[in-house]
A protein has these predicted regions:
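AMP-forming adenylation/ATP pyrophosphatase catalytic core
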Residues: 1-147
Length: 147
């Protein structure tokens, strides 16, 4: 029993919706990058688009703040990020506990990083410092699709 869920069986990771991510992989921008059971699709638009936040597997970020070198990895001890809407950074572990992400799933949640810094906890929240604003000139769209 974890956060009001009953998990039967000896391997609760088998019920995890995220494929295991091994190591750290660079994302092609723009393009499609296959990563551990995911197809990560990226594109850049020169104007601000209507940001649709209904799909948690799609993020819209300020492309100029993100740069051209992003990676995907799982969490490591000491990770911090500034969740959208927060004024200060938060420990990733505390963020996951607060959202009641099952402990056995936390190692598998994909993280998009820039220079080792988490900028998107896929399926949950982007980093506030990389959000699209009125001053954004180019928008980076990143979409994770299961394969």
């Amino acid at each position: 029993v974890e956060y009001g869920r009953y998990l039967l069986g000896s391997d609760t990771k088998a019920l995890c919706p995220y494929p295991e991510i091994i190591g750290e992989s660079e994302i092609k921008i723009p393009g499609v990058t296959p990563i551990s059971g995911w197809a990560v699709e990226t594109s850049i638009t020169e104007k601000v688009v209507d940001v649709d936040n209904r799909n948690e597997f799609v993020a819209y970020l300020d492309a100029d703040k993100c740069g051209r070198s992003l990676t995907v990895r799982s969490r490591i001890d000491g990770d911090h990020f500034q969740p959208l809407g927060f004024d200060t950074p938060k420990r990733l572990n505390r963020f996951m506990i607060d959202l009641k992400i099952p402990q056995t799933w936390r190692e598998r949640v994909p993280l998009v990083c820039r220079d080792g810094q988490v900028i998107w906890v896929v399926d949950y929240r982007i980093d506030d410092r990389y959000k699209v604003t009125a001053d954004t000139k180019r928008v980076l769209k990143i979409e994770f699709k299961r394969v």
